[in-house]
Amino acid sequence: MIIKEHPEDFRVEERIDLVWDLEPGPFRLYTLEKRSWNTTDAFQAAARATGIPWGVIRYGGKKDRQACTVQYGTTPAAFDLSFQRHNVRVTPVGFAPTPMGPRHVKGNKFDVVMRRVEKGHGELLGQRWEEMERHGELNYFDDQRFGGVSSSGAFFAEFVVRKDFSGALRHHMTSHHPEASPAIRRRKRSMDRMWGDWRALRSLAVTPEEREMVGCCLANPGERGILEALGLLSRETWGLYLSSFQSALWNEALALMVRRSSEPLWSLRGKVTSLPFFRHKGTEGAWRSLEIPMPSSELSRSDDEGSRAVGEVLKRHGLKPEDFILTPSFRAHFSSFSRSAVVVPQEGTWGLSDDDRHRGYDKGRVSFFLPAGSYATLILRSLQHSIPGPSSDGPGPG
């Protein structure tokens, strides 16, 4: 079975609650339609082409590169970000009283084609989909959330909460994307070996940010320079790093509670840890109303079941809620909110037909809406588990 064989097989449409109309207002609202582009690159291309400062563009979230997606963004009304290029189009649709942001995203509607489904397996997928529509699925954060974790499993934010600021800066400056070129990998390895020798590192710093960070450490040796360098990180980067670590701890808390149940379990392999799921209908009852807080300095103010589970996870890591209070110079903070333990797909449809690209196979088509913050990829991975063999991650230890 294949998902995302072509971008058209994975369509995402963002839904927002930002009030807007056609009458002129403070902010111009746009749709961004893209295929095989990531969100940031698409908006930046439009900004360069129109001469609009990148800093005035606001949007709700990043959408998958390997997909066909529609989402929203804003600029101040004085600008016009209209833009079209191969596989990307920015179109003005009206005006809004406030800029677009993550808080305005209600969720996303997904339309997904699963190809090369063996004959007979489509019925299993359909049965599993019906179960998920009735009972929901555990609402773990999926692997996309953990882009800030290194190959060793270390999190930037964990260094920060442990007050190892040199380790945090080292993580940021020496980590690289899994698809980075061999030249970048070699340069990052050299930076890691020379860490602390700021004069040597100056010759390896090639981006403006790297040069500025090394400059801080040269001008102010010791912790002061390192704190100044960390203060150069953008709010977006801080947000990604902090939410990544919080989400990993949240997943651990939910997994801890699931493993303590009496239900039979199976598991999915995650980038950070193994994620246990109920084999049958364990998401019924109290699980449907369970809220688990994100780890933060506010945790100690609650004593519900979810808070206790997060507290136990923090204790296992040798951390306390007050560790999540950050140095003011970072201009960043850990968000404090609760997340549902179970997500139920809405507006679902399921269909099965002959695969027009793979003779002798079926294709499944599933459409559904998920609230903001929930992961269609996790729903699809769980759906695949109904198929025996390589397409399933298989049962894991309970």
Q: What does each model-found stretch correspond to?
A:
Residues 1-22, 27, 35-36, 49-50, ...:
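Extended, charged/glycine-rich binding lobes that contact polyanionic ligands
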Residues 395-398:
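Acidic, low-complexity intrinsically disordered tails
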Residues 39-45, 376, 380:
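Ser/Thr-Pro-rich, acidic low-complexity intrinsically disordered regions of eukaryotic RNA-binding
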